[in-house]
Design a protein with these regions (language model features):
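Extended, leucine-rich alpha-helical cores of fungal transcription factors
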Residues: 31-46, 72-94, 99, 108-186, ...
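Amphipathic helix-loop-helix modules that constitute alpha-helical solenoid scaffolds
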Residues: 22, 211, 215, 245-247, ...
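Acidic, Ser/Thr/Pro-rich intrinsically disordered transcriptional activation regions
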Residues: 51-83, 323
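Conserved small-domain helix->loop->beta segment predominantly found in fold-type I
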Residues: 321-328
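Intrinsic, low-complexity transcriptional activation domains
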Residues: 1-57, 80, 84-89, 94
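Charged, glycine/proline-rich intrinsically disordered loops and linkers
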Residues: 2, 6, 10-16, 186-197, ...
Length: 422
C-alpha cells in the first residue's frame, strides 16, 4: 500500500530539485568574466587550502608546496596582481575540500548543500575558463588545473556517470603534451636552442613535477576504469618518464639543477604514496584487465597466482604503512596514504575471488575464495571507518570502496544463510 505522505514528500522533492535546476541553469548562463568573483573570504579560504594540503596532497600529487605558498602569500598581499591560472587553482582547491571540511556548518539550497552548490559553480566556471585557453603552449599550471578539475568533480559527485570518460580524456591530454615521455629527451631535442624559457621547462624541478602529475593521472584513470568495469587505457601504452622520487617538497627547489637522492620507502614523505604505488601499478593494471575483459577466463590456479603476487606487494609495504593498518588512530597526515596503499591492492583480491566465492557451496575448494572476499571487504571497511572516525571523508567521495565492500559482505551472508537452510 502506497503511503500518501511519502508520495507527497517525493513529489515535493522532485519539484524542488527541478526548480533549483532551472535556477542554477539561469544563474550559470551568464559567463563569469572574472574568476576572482567566486573567491571566498581569505580566512575561510586559507583554512580550506590548508586542509587540502593536509589531506589531498598526501596521496595524489598535483602542486609543489613551496611554489604554491609563495604565490599564495603574494596573492594575499596583492590580489589584483594575481594571474587567472592561480585563481583557478585556488577555486578548485577550495572546491575539492568544501564538502569534507567538518568544521563548516551544513546548510542546504534545494536538495544539495550550499557548499556543494557553490563548489559546482566554481567547477563550471573553471571548466569554461579552460575551454577558452590556447593550446599552442601548455604550461604546468594548466596541467595542474585540469587534474584539480577532475578531482574536484569527483569530490562533489558532479557528473558521476562521466567519471571514466573524463579520466580517459585527462589521460589523453597528458599523452598529447608528452607527460609520459622521459623529460631528458626534451633536453636532447632542444639542446641547441638558446631560448631560456624552453631550457627552464626541463629544469630538475619541472622534470619531477611532470613525473608526479603523470603518476597521479594514471592512478586516477586506472581507478576510474576499475570502478566503471573497463580495462584501463594505459594497458596499451608505454611510458619512459620514470617514477617520482621519494623526496619532500621542501627538498625540491625550483632552481635545483639536480634532484636530491630519493629516500628509501621506509622514510615517509609527501611523495611516498606515489612512489610506493608505482611499484604495484603494472600488477594492478594487469589484474584490472583480467577482471574486466569479457574474453579472459582466469583459472583458479591463475587466480591463486595473482593472489600470491598481491599479498607479496601488501607484505612489502614499509613499516609506517603497517603501523597505520594495525592502529585505530588515523589522525596523522600519513594515515590516508598508508590506508589507501592497502585498499587499492585489496580491492583486487575482492573482485578476483568473488566469481569463485559464489560457488563455494558446490565446490569446497572455493571456500577459500569466500573467506578471502569476507576478509578483504571487512578490512577495507575497517580502514574507511578509521578515516571517518578521525574526520577524514576523502575516500568516501573519491572512491566506491564502501559500497562495493558492503555489497560483497551482504552477498556472502546471503549465500551462507542459503547453505545453512539447505
Amino acid at each position: 500500500m502506497r503511503s500518501q505522505t511519502l508520495y507527497r514528500v517525493r513529489t515535493m522533492a522532485k519539484e524542488l530539485k527541478e526548480r533549483h535546476r532551472k535556477e542554477k541553469k539561469l544563474a550559470t548562463s551568464r559567463r563569469i568574466q572574472n574568476l576572482s568573483e567566486l573567491l571566498l573570504d581569505k580566512n575561510e579560504m586559507t583554512q580550506l587550502i590548508q586542509f587540502y594540503w593536509n589531506v589531498m596532497e598526501s596521496t595524489y600529487r598535483v602542486l609543489h608546496g613551496p611554489t604554491f605558498w609563495s604565490k599564495y602569500r603574494i596573492f594575499c598581499e596583492q590580489p589584483s596582481n594575481t594571474s587567472e591560472d592561480f585563481i583557478a587553482i585556488l577555486l578548485l582547491i577550495v572546491a575539492c575540500t568544501r564538502c569534507i571540511y567538518a568544521k563548516q556548518q551544513t546548510s542546504y539550497r534545494g536538495l544539495t548543500s550550499v557548499n556543494r552548490d557553490e563548489a559546482i559553480t566554481s567547477i563550471m566556471a573553471c571548466e569554461d575558463w579552460i575551454s577558452r585557453q590556447s593550446r599552442k603552449y601548455t604550461s604546468i599550471e594548466l596541467v595542474q588545473i585540469r587534474v584539480l578539475l577532475y578531482i574536484a568533480k569527483r569530490m562533489n559527485s558532479y557528473h558521476v556517470k562521466r567519471s571514466w570518460e573524463e579520466a580517459a580524456s585527462l589521460l589523453n591530454f597528458a599523452l598529447g603534451i608528452g607527460l609520459h615521455r622521459d623529460p631528458m629527451l626534451l633536453e636532447k631535442a632542444i639542446g641547441a636552442c638558446s631560448n631560456s624559457d624552453i631550457k627552464q621547462m626541463t629544469s630538475a624541478h619541472e622534470k619531477e613535477m611532470r613525473r608526479r602529475i603523470w603518476a597521479t593521472i594514471i592512478e586516477l584513470e586506472l581507478q576510474a576504469a576499475f570502478d566503471r568495469g573497463f580495462p584501463s587505457s594505459i594497458n596499451s601504452l608505454s611510458a619512459d618518464c620514470g617514477t617520482p622520487s621519494n623526496i619532500g617538497d621542501e627538498e625540491l627547489e625550483e632552481i635545483s639543477k639536480q634532484l636530491p637522492f630519493s629516500k628509501p620507502p621506509e622514510f615517509y614523505t609527501t611523495n611516498s604514496f606515489l612512489c610506493i604505488s608505482s611499484r604495484s601499478f603494472a600488477l594492478r593494471s594487469e589484474m584490472n584487465r583480467i577482471i574486466n575483459d569479457p574474453k579472459i577466463h582466469l583459472s583458479y590456479d591463475g587466480l591463486l597466482h595473482y593472489h600470491s603476487r598481491t599479498m607479496e606487494e601488501l607484505e612489502k609495504m614499509p613499516r609506517w604503512v603497517d603501523t597505520h593498518r594495525r592502529n585505530d588512530n588515523a589522525s596523522s597526515v600519513s594515515a590516508l596514504p598508508a590506508l589507501l596503499l592497502d585498499i587499492q591492492l585489496r580491492q583486487y583480491l575482492l573482485l578476483l575471488h568473488l566469481p569463485y566465492a559464489q560457488h563455494a557451496d558446490s565446490k569446497s575448494r572455493y571456500s577459500y575464495s569466500r573467506m578471502v572476499c569476507l576478509n578483504a571487504a571487512n578490512t577495507i571497511l575497517e580502514h574507511h571507518s578509521k578515516l571517518v572516525a578521525s574526520g577524514n571523508y576523502t575516500l568516501n567521495l573519491l572512491r566506491h570502496d564502501v559500497f562495493r565492500s558492503s555489497l560483497a559482505m551482504c552477498h556472502s551472508v546471503i549465500l551462507w544463510k542459503s547453505v545453512q537452510s539447505k
